[in-house]
Amino acid sequence: MIKKYLFLFFIFLIFNFVLSIQPPLSEYNCLKNFVTKFKLSTKFPTNSTGGYDFCSIVSCNPVNGSINGFLSLQSESTTPTTVTVVGTDLSCLPFNNLNLQNFLISTTLLYTKFFTSCSTLAINSDSITSITQVLAPYETFTIVSKKLNGALKMSNFINQKSILITNSNSTSGYTLVNDALAENKIKLETPNFSGLLSVPDLTGYTSLGYPAFYFSDALEVTSLALANIKTIGAVSSRLYFPSTKTIQFPTSYHNDTSYLTIQGKFTKPTAVIDLSKFVNCRNIQILNYDKTFNINGEIPIKTSPFTDIYYTDGNITKIPIGGTSFVTWSTEQSITIKKSGLSGTLPPLSGVIPTYYDFSGNSISGTLSNTWCNTNIIVTDNLMTGTLPSCIVCHLNNSEVAKKFTGNKFTNLVTSNPPCTTFAPKIKVDKSQKTIILTGTDFGTYTSGWILNTTLSCEKLWTKVTYGSNYTCTYPSTTTLDKVSYFWINFNTPGRNYTFPAISQVPTPNSIIVGTSNSVTISGTFFSTYIGYVTQSISVGSISCTVGTSSFSSITCTLDSAPSTNTEQKLIITTNSLIKEAYISTVVGFNNNKLCPNDCTSSTRGICYMNNGTCKCNSGYVGLDCSGLQCKVPNCSNGGTCNTTVGLCVCDSSHQSLDCSLDFKQCPKGLNSLICSGGGNSCNNQTGICTCNSSHQGLNCSINYKQCPIGSNSLICSGGGNSCNNQTGICKCDSSHQGSDCANDFIQCPLKNSIPCSGHGICNNKTGDCTCDSGFTNQDCSGYTCTSNNCNGHGVCDTSKGICQCYPEWQDIDCQTPFKNCLDPTCSNNGICKNTTGICECNSSHQGLTCSIDFNQCPIGSNSLICSGGSGNICNNQTGICTCDSSHQGPDCGTDFIKCPTQNLTPCNGFGNCNNITGSCSCDQNHQSEDCNIVYKECPIINSLICNGFDNSCNNQTGVCTCDDLHQGLDCGLEYKPCINNCNGNGVCNNQTSICTCYEAYQGETCQFQINQCPNNCTTGGDCDTITGICNCYPLRINNDCSGYECLDPNCGDHGICNDMNGLCICDKGYRGDNCIYVDHYASSVIPTKEEGGTVLIYGLFGEINNDPNVQVGNSNCLISNITSNSIECIIGKGSGIKDISVTQNGFEWIGKSMFNYIKSKQSCPNNCNSNGICNDLQGKCECYPGFTGHDCNSLSKTDLISPSTPKVNENTANGIIENGENKFEIMVITLQEKTFTNGVLKQYNLENNWKLLEIINDENNNIFKFKQNLTDSSEISINLEIIKKDRIINFADYSFEISKDSIKVSINISNYIYSNSLNYLQLHLKSNAYKTNKTSSDDEFDCNLDDGSDAKIDNQDLENSNINHENFVTIIKDNKILNGRYIDHVISDGISTFISSRTIEKDSNSITVGLNLPHCKNCLIDPDFSVLLSTDFKENCSDSNSNNYIIPVSITVSIGGAAVLVGSAIFFYRKKFIENTLKIQLKRLSKNNSSGSDGGNTQS
């Protein structure tokens, strides 16, 4: 309770703090003058003191009260006024967004940019009747007027990225003229034109994003120019035609259009509208004003399979599932049909169909079957009943799911803890594809609610494979899933968390407890994901344990009976095919949680005793973790040792065999030093004797051996005179034998021409006989054989030729065929005589023994018989004609002959033709009946149907239609539709259309409602529901009269507010983009690379969204290798010099002018050291010869001539003072300016004489004075002045510098400065004064170093050229003494060294002011310093007088801290350095003080 009151009290304090804020005085007076001028007393009442509490009414900065955000002002005058808003009325306010309502507007306000910090201007004023000039360069410009008419030139909108022009008078309008030059058409992105009279031609506008076009009621359909729609090349095109005009639905669009919205009253199409060629269109929205845009109750368009369809307020009677009569939809489409009269029951799904349907606001009835589970179905506000399927019920605790089904009468639509017993996701990990696959039952489609643990993460959202049943998640390649055993997924709906295995692993228990009542509790991993997909069984000993609950990490089960407690019992857990065994103690309450080493390696090697953590190894395995293999003979027969790694004996040198039980003796080695000469020879290590292979012989098998063949008499080479060579293995036979084994006798065959068997046969030397080749004969194979050796006994074979000579009665090559002659050997020249039979073979057109008679085939009937067979049908095959009997007809006699009805002996009564095939009459057009004796009259035909079809009937004797109850007319072609309730007496019924024509004051289908007008007639932004008097706004239109425009993201990314005048987001400071999702990026520091090229580091603010990032250095691209929210790393090629740097992302460019400076490999020295030193080109610094000093060695180093200096700090002014002799030098921080990118001064803070001393520190080492002053309520500037007590080295921005004793070091801190605009930058001014004190020296009149009255010599080239050795010098030579002002060209920006610039601002006869251009950073440190040295022209002796030299060292460090808030802008120009032309500075000589004074003293002026 106390916390509650404290919280309320805190809110009270905040509320009062907000109410107490007031704008700065100048802004307060500015707004007060406007309120007074226009008498805005209602919105801005005075308070009790007579003043105004502006910040309680308008948007003020919560810190300093500045009106630098959104300002909306509305006239309160109800009568015409002549008081006009002019630019100077409000140019004194720093708002960035201005909205003016109902004022009389000066035209100069339209064409001149008075409000420099403003990027968005909206004006609603009927005083604007035309736009005749180029509008002022506000990026977003809105003009609303009821009197804006005529032709508006697009060339007047070239300065706008977003333009909204509205004529809110529905009886008039305007047109657009495309007259802008091509280069001026690029900037416009979001045009919004309302009140158009025709479709504009936007040819050449290539940057369009989301244009919208609202057409006036006054348009003429004939001049609408619908063809111009194809010139609108935009991401999304929106066209809203008035409800008062009927137009043709446009059919031609630009190919680049991805999203199309079109609203209107469209004529009823007569054919399907084919838009399928516009394949780039991803979504088309059709918003109807009436019910005519359909074909037979279906959507009348055909789209590509990638186009989503949104159709509303039409008349669609058929519930489309897989498509329409004109097109089949694909799974890639989404279908939305709202408030269009869909009715009937929702059918179950089948086939390939879209996965998204929105049927909201229709009249669909029936139940929702589970076939819809794999779709995203929305049926809000229908008439459905019954129960929702489980796939939906499981996720009703998600309001996004539940609202899809509200407005029906589902009995189980429970949103709080809905019952869910079927939820069962299933996971598979595919490591090869680095993919997690999710399948299962009723796990839903709300993928953003599926959260993986930190072990894994999806690179993107879950990817749909099959909607509602199969999804995949690709995890990053950096994730080593091999090292991950399992992971969990939290399913937001229905609110369950499950752990899934990443690998296949046996159950792994780590704790097992047997409890009372025979209960068993097991903890560990890899048991089960959940019920449904894993079969488990558990037993302890021989007792089964019935599973009660099971999860990935635990199991509870109940034993069927009490287990034995005498000894450990074996626990067996079986999960599918994976088995885990362990021995446990079954003593009640004992925790078996002792894990064995390496889990006993595997279940096949050993089992863990979890009561004591020891392994029981299975047979064949040994070791603490059973990882070793036991040898078959454990002691290896005392002839060796067992190697348990491989389970084999390692024998000693005198034993062998697997168990080392056999002795070992070495066999002799061959000439090749191999035992038994190697090869296939073997050694008997028990006897030491070689056994040679079949190819070797000898004691060591070194001699080759080849066995000769053995003959049939079992003798080598068959014995006898034959011999064997067992080196080669070849027999040598004697002259009477042959063969490889010399076993065969040798006998010569008959010879011809000394050739055995005449060369035509094979000689058998065993018998001496020839075997002749085919075709040869005789003993020596010299003769030829006939085909038949004896010519079949009907002839004689001539072996010299191999040909049969046949006897006269026979023929053929082998004389086997008798020879017979025909009766007419010529066969009448109509055939061929066959001598084998003596019969003529006639051709197809003749017949007879001699082929002299013609032959013609008669037709064959369908029964495959000639003349169809039958006894009465006869074929004449000389003529080929059938003669049919009396009951048949036709060429093949295959058709029956039937007589027709006859009247007066005349078939068909003479009024028709007889078909003797069917026996029926075909009456002429004027007769009917079987015999054509009845007259026929035709009834009227419509729609190609007699009497229009349906249940209408025709009397063909009279030709008159009889209509059913639903039709009327001579041809029944008119529908008969009675009106409901006869129009309630408030109108006239048309019973052809069943439509009531209501009297003037009534409306509705049955004239049942009175007409109620809507506010402002819905301002052309919506349709008036005249029943309720409430506007139904068009998409993206809002407010009760639809006068407002809804932003694409109404929440503006939670970083802005939506301006309903133009539908554009007004982003908070620090954000930008159409939806305010991008940060206003900038760079605060750059670490460059050498001229050879390399890695560049850029630090700043870049946000989490980095779309299409690009870095340019000068004209070179810097290839990005890494980008984070606050840094960019990129690689660039070689270059040189100072370059602009630009960072582009999310479509916006930021530019840092002269922010990048290539690092030189060799540095040049200033003035080449004036020949008084050597240039160190690595550092760009002079190493002066003895006697010289200074940055360019142009000064003398004699310090014995120098009078000591006296440093001081003025505690009232915070000025640093150094006095030396009669000269006094002051160092002051005088001004801080906020400047625009065009160098204009927006704000200036005069710092002089406003410092407050905070603290003085004075000890042995330090003497520091601390000051500060407030810049605004939220920002301040502080300064520390330190008097240096001893020489020391200062390290700054990676460089080292020496600062001398008696110097003054100045540190400046600017914190929490809030910029008016991100285009702006800060410039800090430091001023140095040189004076003569009132004291003079008697030596002065003799000092030859005093000037002669001429001007001082000034050299500021280094300051204007920052590309030399990181040091910029301003050199002032006076009295032969040199004042060196050193400005380092680097700054420590948020802890990082980066390049900056400094420049001369102003000079006069005794002072110089230097400006430091500060980077955009939270903390910046800048370190200039000053010193006075001797010129080389300095004279040590002037006659009789001594000269004096003055050295004034000053060091200044500046820091900027805190948060600087940026205002959104299209392009950032960050002012890092301003390089001016060489400034010729001439300081007038210091006036010589001739007044007398005490010698040697210094006084403070």
Swiss-Prot record:
Entry keyword Nucleotide-binding: no
Positions of disulphide bridges: 631-642, 636-649, 651-660, 786-797, 791-804, 806-815, 822-833, 827-840, 842-851, 900-914, 908-921, 923-932, 979-989, 983-996, 998-1007, 1047-1058, 1052-1065, 1067-1076, 1165-1175, 1169-1182, 1184-1193
Induction summary: Down-regulated by Pseudomonas aeruginosa, PAO1 strain and up-regulated by PA14 strain infection.
Membrane-traversing stretches: 1447-1467
One cellular component term from this protein's GO annotations in UniProt: membrane
Side of membrane Extracellular, spans: 21-1446
Its membrane topology: Single-pass type I membrane protein
Disruption phenotype: Cells are unable to sporulate when in pure population although they will sporulate when in chimerae with wild-type cells. Cells form loose aggregate before disaggregating. Cells aggregate and disaggregate in waves. comC-/lagC-/tgrD1-mutant fails to form spores.
Protein keywords: Developmental protein, Disulfide bond, EGF-like domain, Glycoprotein, Membrane, Repeat, Signal, Transmembrane, Transmembrane helix
Purpose: Regulates aggregation via a pathway that involves lagC and tgrD1/lagD. Inhibits lagC and activates lagD expression.
Name of the protein this chain belongs to: EGF-like domain-containing protein comC
